[in-house]
């Protein structure tokens, strides 16, 4: 592509560097986190003084052509049911990543518990079917106008809720907003309390888990919403606010369909995160220009 070549600064074909040099330079750019730093600077320079209504968070799968790192599972020790015997001490349950993050103050501390190694992920899609993939996950926070503010890369086997607090914490530092919008995968009082602590209003969908009563209640609410939509009636304010969460799904679509994040051939978390960061930066600038015009 002659136009692209000239735009990149190479007038003649012979000026284009070799593939090996491209690879070395990209490795250096990835190590320096050029894309991530540029994205942070852009948000700081042009979006910091804007008040946004919503911050929607979600994670999307990132399939990779890489072998997953084997995780050694602890041998299961069967526990005796009932109360412990007199003088018997039982080991307390290991707290989840989210529970450990609750008492941490910095994003760096929180992310120290999150793995970036290639893993095997399993997620339920919008149709209720489970999808399995090898690779990682991209966790993003998006504000009004489909503008991504924060992006964090993790292994595929990391639960969405494990990156919720770092996302909220980082986004709150960068811009001002009112509502935190998240799906049922983030249903936790720890996340709600953290959001309120930063003066936001959390709107998080309920995860029924194994409760039949909750499942029936959620189904009734969904049926009611459909009737309201058919009759074109005004729904509750919370429903209206929560429906804005679709903007994070649109950004995931832009990244994969328009900005080259659907097929990543690099290996290693640093390079993969850099590719995704360039995509996030492009979407951020593109959508910000739309908002201005």
Located regions from the model:
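Helix-centered, glycine/charged polyanion-binding patches within enzymatic domains
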Residues: 184-257
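Short, positively charged, Gly/Tyr-enriched micro-motifs
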Residues: 1-37
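Short connector loops/turns at beta-strand edges and beta->alpha or beta->beta junctions
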Residues: 1-2, 143-146, 260
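Short hydrophobic "helix-edge" motifs at membrane interfaces and signal-peptide entry regions
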Residues: 8-9, 48-49, 173-174, 238-240
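An alpha-helix initiation/capping motif
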Residues: 16, 20, 185, 271-275
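Basic, amphipathic alpha-helical segments enriched in Lys/Arg and hydrophobic/aromatic residues
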Residues: 230, 234-293
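Polybasic low-complexity intrinsically disordered regions
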Residues: 23-197
């Amino acid at each position: 592509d002659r136009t692209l070549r000239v735009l990149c600064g190479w007038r003649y074909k012979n000026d284009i560097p070799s593939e090996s040099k491209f690879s070395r330079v990209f490795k250096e750019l990835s190590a320096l986190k050029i894309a991530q730093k540029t994205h942070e600077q852009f948000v700081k320079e042009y979006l910091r003084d804007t008040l946004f209504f919503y911050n929607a968070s979600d994670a999307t799968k990132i399939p990779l052509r890489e072998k997953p790192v084997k995780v050694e599972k602890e041998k299961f020790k069967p526990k005796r049911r009932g109360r412990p015997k007199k003088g018997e001490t039982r080991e307390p349950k290991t707290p989840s990543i989210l529970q450990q993050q609750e008492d941490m103050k910095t994003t760096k501390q929180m992310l120290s518990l999150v793995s970036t190694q290639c893993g095997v992920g399993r997620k339920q899609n919008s149709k209720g079917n489970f999808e399995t993939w090898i690779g990682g996950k991209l966790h993003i926070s998006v504000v009004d106008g489909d503008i991504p503010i924060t992006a964090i890369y993790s292994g595929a086997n990391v639960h969405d809720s494990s990156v919720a607090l770092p996302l909220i914490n980082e986004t709150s530092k960068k811009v001002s907003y009112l509502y935190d919008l998240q799906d049922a995968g983030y249903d936790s009082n720890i996340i709600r309390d953290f959001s309120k602590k930063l003066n936001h209003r959390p709107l998080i969908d309920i995860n029924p888990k194994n409760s039949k009563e909750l499942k029936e209640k959620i189904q009734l609410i969904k049926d009611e919403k459909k009737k309201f939509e058919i009759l074109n009636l005004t729904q509750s304010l919370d429903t209206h606010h929560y429906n804005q969460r679709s903007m994070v799904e649109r950004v995931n679509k832009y990244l994969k369909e328009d900005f080259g994040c659907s097929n990543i051939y690099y290996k290693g978390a640093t390079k993969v995160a850099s590719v995704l960061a360039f995509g996030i930066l492009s979407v951020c600038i593109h959508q910000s220009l739309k908002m201005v015009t």
